């Protein structure tokens, strides 16, 4: 997508190519089904640098070699193509920003900021302060939107946290989506949104019809290179997305919400009633 509108009804900010489809595919299906305009902005759309040989880069590139190719150019070209296909299913626009995934970011002297798998879910590196500032400026220059959606940061992935922080600086009125598949880890949602702090937040449940859930599943299935990261295959993908929808329904029912008889799944977004932020770099 090369031409953009001046205004969108819904603007979703996605840390990686597949995050918004995984977390919000059902609600986007619903938005576009009634004629609302949607733009999905993928933050880490930059071409990986050649020659970076950290542990995590080597592991992921070996896994992706068959589906994405072995060169940085091939990897990003295929991932962008998957993104366009996924949101073509949902009839949403796509924009790729030119920021590096955390696994490719380095210090000025070339040392990886996040060299190992566990580092992606650890503490922020102070070197990412400049990334947050630059990303906030880029996000502030996006088209106007009726509603902006940011990742809540469930699971603690560095890129999700960077995206949230930058988005909070760029936009005044935002809602937060629950980051799937990290929501499936017991306690992960509570870690970023403690039960004791729920009074500071207001949740909204988006109920999904069978058609919307199927549309979401088809969208996520477009990320063929990533399926093995979270699922054993397409059948497992469909089953787990349905399981996630049932998790949200169960949570809504526990909170006293009336579940429509036609709902086969759900997604949930959150609005802040009071200031609540992720821990700072210094903490």
Regions found by a protein language model. Give the residues of each.
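Active-site rim/loop-helix segments in enzyme catalytic domains that contact anionic ligands
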Residues: 1-125, 132, 137, 141, ...
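Short, well-ordered beta-to-alpha junction loops that form the rim of enzyme active sites
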Residues: 15, 97-100, 146, 150-160, ...
């Amino acid at each position: 997508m090369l031409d953009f509108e001046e205004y969108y009804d819904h603007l979703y900010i996605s840390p990686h190519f597949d995050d918004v489809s995984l977390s919000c595919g059902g609600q986007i299906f619903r938005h576009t089904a009634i004629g609302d305009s949607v733009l999905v902005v993928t933050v880490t759309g930059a071409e990986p640098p050649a020659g970076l040989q950290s542990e995590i880069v080597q592991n992921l590139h070996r896994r992706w070699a068959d589906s994405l190719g072995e060169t940085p150019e091939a990897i990003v070209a295929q991932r962008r193509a998957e993104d366009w296909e996924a949101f073509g299913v949902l009839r949403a626009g796509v924009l790729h920003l030119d920021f590096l995934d955390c696994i490719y970011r380095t210090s000025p002297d070339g040392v990886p900021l996040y060299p190992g798998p566990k580092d992606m879910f650890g503490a922020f590196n102070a070197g990412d302060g400049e990334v947050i500032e630059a990303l906030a400026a880029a996000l502030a220059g996006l088209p106007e939107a009726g509603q902006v959606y940011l990742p809540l940061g469930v699971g603690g992935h560095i890129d999700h946290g960077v995206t949230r922080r930058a988005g909070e600086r760029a936009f005044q009125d935002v809602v937060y989506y629950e980051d799937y598949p990290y929501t499936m880890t017991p306690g992960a949602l509570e870690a970023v949104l403690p039960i004791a702090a729920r009074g500071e937040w207001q949740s909204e449940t988006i109920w999904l019809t069978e058609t919307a859930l199927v549309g979401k599943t088809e969208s996520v299935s477009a990320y063929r290179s990533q399926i093995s990261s979270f699922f054993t295959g397409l059948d497992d993908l469909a089953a787990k997305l349905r399981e996630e929808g049932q998790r949200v329904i169960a949570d809504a029912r526990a909170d006293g919400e009336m579940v429509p008889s036609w709902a086969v799944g759900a997604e949930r977004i959150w609005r802040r009633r009071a200031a609540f932020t992720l821990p700072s770099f210094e903490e």
